Amino acid sequence: MKIRLSITIILLSYTVATVAGQQCGRQGGGRTCPGNICCSQYGYCGTTADYCSPTNNCQSNCWGSGPSGPGESASNVRATYHFYNPAQNNWDLRAVSAYCSTWDADKPYAWRSKYGWTAFCGPAGPRGQASCGKCLRVKNTRTNAAVTVRIVDQCSNGGLDLDVAMFNQIDTDGFGYQQGHLIVDYQFVDCGNELIGQPDSRNMLVSAIDRV
């Protein structure tokens, strides 16, 4: 009985060590860890905070990153800008080294170009791989100008890092440019991906701006 128990413990230890040593995420070709185990920022599977915490840039199956449908939102969030220039880069996620390119670079052109791009690290909603491809409605709290964007990258400012064109669309009074950032509200919204592939989908607006 003791021998059998010892063998079982050894096998379990070997299994845990094997899982922890597996590569995942962008380092592992987009693979996720078995058994919903977390994938760390360095591409290894594990179950501690080093692997699972969003603040440690966990890539997938992270703590607090369950499914997030339309509706999750946050207010008074910092939004900076980044020069993705997707149109000039043929809407190629790999060309701009976007984090989400591991999973989304081969999506149809109509999917990649339907909305302007943003990096996301806001206080509400999924992080890492779980956020990739999701859409946000972003509103400038100062002017109420709003735009819909798609998450293609990570950031570290605690909010959003909008493509400069999207930033400028909602910076209607120029105050954001003057101070280097905007204060925005955001809400996860349905991307309407079921429309992709229909006739004229490539002619759809890249983004919509309005005043609420």
Swiss-Prot record:
What are its GO cellular component terms? secretory vesicle; vacuole
Q: What induces it?
A: Up-regulated by ethylene, methyl jasmonate, wounding and virus infection. Weakly induced by salicylic acid and 2,6-dichlorisonicotinic acid.
Signal sequence span is 1-21
Q: What is its EC number?
A: 3.1.-.-
Recite the UniProt keywords alphabetically: Antimicrobial, Chitin-binding, Disulfide bond, Fungicide, Hydrolase, Nuclease, Pathogenesis-related protein, Plant defense, Signal, Vacuole
**One BP annotation, GO:** killing of cells of another organism
The chain positions of domain Barwin read: 72-193
Record text about domains = The C-terminal vacuolar sorting signal (VSS) (194-212) is required for vacuolar localization.
The name under which this protein is listed is: Hevein-like preproprotein
